[in-house]
Design a protein with these regions (language model features):
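Residue-level detector of anion-binding/catalytic polar loops
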Residues: 35, 104, 183
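Helix N-cap/beta->alpha junction signal
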Residues: 17, 89, 109-112, 170
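Asp-based, Mg2+/Mn2+-dependent phosphohydrolase catalytic module
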Residues: 1-4, 96, 112-214
């Protein structure tokens, strides 16, 4: 085994949530007077913790988002998850293989613990992720692109950073893994390869990943 721990991003890597979330985010920001297209939401906010969305909107417009922004946004997202969320193609087979081969793994997401739980329950991925394998930006002081979340996950899992590999689909996540001095495999299903500069290796389907990890 090349690594002692596989650290997965969640949204867009394990659960196919990015199209849902960014469609809702773009529409809600536009509704609030901050015109945003789906493509702009993907470009600017994919992989971000909620506080970073607030910071970017205020930086660009000089206006604060409403105090209930997070609650309204998550309410809309969770309702959509219940209707249509699916695992990323190949995620179930990959997790089955890692579990069968006794490869240690966890998830480290910019999303809240509630968002992770809702997504995993809806897609059936919760069977592979007990609480000890789930880490959120809520657990640390700084979210991606800071290394804190990945370093926290490695520490909690008892693995040295240099023995970890991160699986990411966002530029922020790749930067965070680089800052943590971990190898990172960049998933290009949603993000152009050119935007994942710094990735140790790129792949386009989860079916390719098992062979890269051994």
């Amino acid at each position: 085994m090349r690594y002692d721990l596989v650290i997965f991003d969640n949204d867009g890597v394990l659960v196919d949530s990015e199209p849902i979330s960014n469609t809702i985010l773009a529409a809600y920001l536009t509704e609030l007077g901050h015109p945003t297209s789906y493509e702009e939401s993907i470009r600017d906010y994919m992989g971000s913790a909620m506080h970073r969305i607030h910071e970017l909107v205020q930086e660009r417009s000089g206006q604060r988002l409403p105090e209930d922004f997070d609650d309204v946004f998550h309410g809309r997202v969770f309702a959509a998850f219940e209707r249509e969320l699916q695992p990323v193609p190949g995620a179930v087979q990959l997790l089955e293989k890692l579990a069968a081969d006794e490869v240690p793994y966890c998830v480290a997401s910019s999303g809240s613990h509630e968002r992770i739980r809702v997504g995993h329950r809806k897609t059936g991925l919760d069977r592979w992720f007990d609480e000890g394998r789930v880490f959120s930006s809520q657990d640390v002081g700084r979210g991606k692109p800071a290394p804190d979340l990945f370093l926290h996950a490695a520490e909690r899992m008892g693995v040295a950073p240099e023995r970890c590999v991160v699986v990411e689909d966002s530029p922020l996540g790749v930067r965070a893994a680089n800052a943590a001095e971990m190898d990172v495999y960049g998933f290009t299903a949603m993000t152009p390869a050119a935007k994942l500069t710094g990735a140790t290796q790129l792949f386009s389907e989860l079916g390719e990943l098992a062979d890269l990890l051994v």
